[in-house]
């Protein structure tokens, strides 16, 4: 993976400005404090500060010394994360566990965003940890309410700040649907690290404002996790989704919690972990029931049904799908959060088609996959998914020419996207068609897939 350019550090610049401290002044005070503490090896000057402002991460103990110097000048504690520098002692499980205290949630997520911006080895090499998923779901279900979001910093957070986060989240979500997660990930991460982290750490907020801020952060963190998942960065995605769930708990937002748990179930299914997907889906259902949206509950039910299908449990899958259909029949748009607008009859049909595909019921899969194509044209990636799904059903029906015709439509859309999932679904289709390599259309299509799609990203094959 190519290294991203080093990000500048506006937070350090802002703190130096607030403290009225020059580059030379900061360097001199850092050296003096190091000597006073008996740390003789610290050497820095104004050019060192210029490098820090450009995004360089100094080695320990320099970040802690900078924080102490600026804290003394400002008359308040300055944590290392507020400097725009990642603490040097990041734990290997950063972001994998669900915190319950607001201060812990802010510190963990800010450190996660900063480490991701800096492409720290911890996250570049982050693996998906299946054992961490049920623990988060259990904690969501059984823990007492999380602490209320409150900040006492110098920056007043108001309604306009929260609406700005939500507006940008909506814009990013629309772009994600049209372009795929790869093009969006850096933009979303930069906004989280540069702007949202600043509000959380330095903001003054409490009560309803604090809860609304937590909910907005949860929505954006969930989207950040989703685009990382779509980009094939599953270990990073898992950490973002877990922290998004923490923000939903602090906000007391059961609907958002259900959506995030369903997203975690979605990822678990993709990574062939159906047991964990079922557990997460059931936790999501509990949250959805507390909110009261029948549409949201339907989403959580079909995720559970897909988990049963992936385990080849046709009976449990059928029972759960029937419950999902009855639930959706009584759904109304008035019950739904704005971010749930994507879930409609076409989306439900696609989820059902995936269940029947995994159960080996090709005719049912094809019928529902065709229904799924009666969808909103703004969801380009979703259409690519559904076309690949229909093509896969045709392949299972032993109709290789039809599979290649529909698969080529999916391929034409996929090459416009930066979506590891979309590319992998096409490769999976080509793999399923391989036994019919005697058919000219199959040979042509599989060759075109190899030629037009980039090298495979590092992620597991979908079910």
Where are these predicted regions, by residue range?
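Short amphipathic alpha-helical interaction patches enriched in hydrophobic/aromatic residues
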Residues: 16, 34, 53, 176-179, ...
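A general structural signal for alpha-helical elements within enzymatic catalytic domains
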Residues: 31-35, 71, 201, 329
């Amino acid at each position: 993976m190519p290294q991203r350019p080093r990000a500048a550090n506006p937070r350090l610049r802002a703190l130096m400005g607030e403290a009225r401290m020059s580059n030379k002044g900061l360097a001199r005070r850092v050296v003096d404090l190091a000597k006073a503490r008996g740390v003789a090896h610290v050497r820095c000057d104004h050019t060192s500060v210029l490098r820090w402002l450009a995004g360089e991460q100094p080695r320990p103990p320099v970040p802690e010394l900078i924080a102490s110097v600026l804290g003394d000048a400002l008359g308040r504690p300055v944590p290392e994360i507020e400097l725009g520098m990642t603490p040097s002692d990041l734990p290997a499980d950063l972001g994998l566990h669900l915190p319950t205290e607001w201060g812990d949630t802010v510190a963990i997520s800010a450190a996660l965003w900063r480490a991701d911006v800096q492409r720290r080895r911890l996250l570049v090499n982050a693996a998906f940890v299946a054992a961490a998923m049920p623990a988060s779901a259990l904690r969501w279900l059984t823990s007492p309410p999380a602490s209320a979001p409150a900040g006492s910093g110098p920056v007043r957070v108001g309604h306009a700040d929260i609406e700005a986060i939500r507006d940008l989240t909506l814009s990013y979500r629309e772009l994600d649907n049209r372009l795929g997660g790869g093009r969006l990930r850096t933009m979303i991460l930069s906004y989280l690290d540069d702007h949202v982290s600043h509000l959380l750490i330095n903001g003054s907020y409490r009560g309803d404002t604090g809860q609304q801020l937590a909910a907005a952060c949860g929505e954006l963190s969930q989207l950040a996790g989703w685009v990382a998942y779509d980009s094939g960065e599953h270990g990073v995605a898992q950490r973002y989704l877990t922290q998004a769930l923490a923000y939903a708990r602090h906000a007391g937002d059961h609907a958002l919690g259900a959506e995030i748990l369903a997203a975690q179930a979605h990822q678990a299914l993709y990574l062939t972990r159906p047991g964990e997907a079922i557990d997460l889906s059931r936790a999501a259902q509990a949250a959805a029931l507390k909110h009261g949206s029948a549409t949201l509950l339907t989403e959580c039910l079909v995720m559970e049904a897909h988990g049963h299908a992936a385990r080849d449990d046709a009976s449990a899958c059928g029972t759960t799908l029937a419950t999902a259909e009855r639930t959706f029949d009584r759904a109304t748009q008035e019950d739904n959060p704005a971010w749930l607008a994507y879930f409609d009859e076409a989306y439900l049909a696609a989820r059902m088609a995936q269940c029947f595909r995994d159960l080996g019921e090709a005719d049912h899969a094809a019928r529902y996959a065709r229904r799924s194509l009666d969808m909103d044209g703004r969801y380009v990636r979703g259409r690519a998914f559904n076309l690949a799904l229909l093509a896969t059903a045709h392949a299972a029906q032993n109709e290789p020419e039809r599979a290649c015709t529909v698969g080529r439509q999916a391929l034409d859309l996929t090459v416009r996207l930066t979506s590891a999932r979309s590319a992998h679904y096409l490769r999976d289709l080509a793999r399923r068609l391989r036994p019919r390599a005697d058919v000219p259309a199959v040979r042509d299509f599989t060759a075109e897939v190899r030629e037009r799609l980039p090298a495979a990203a590092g992620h597991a094959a979908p079910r």
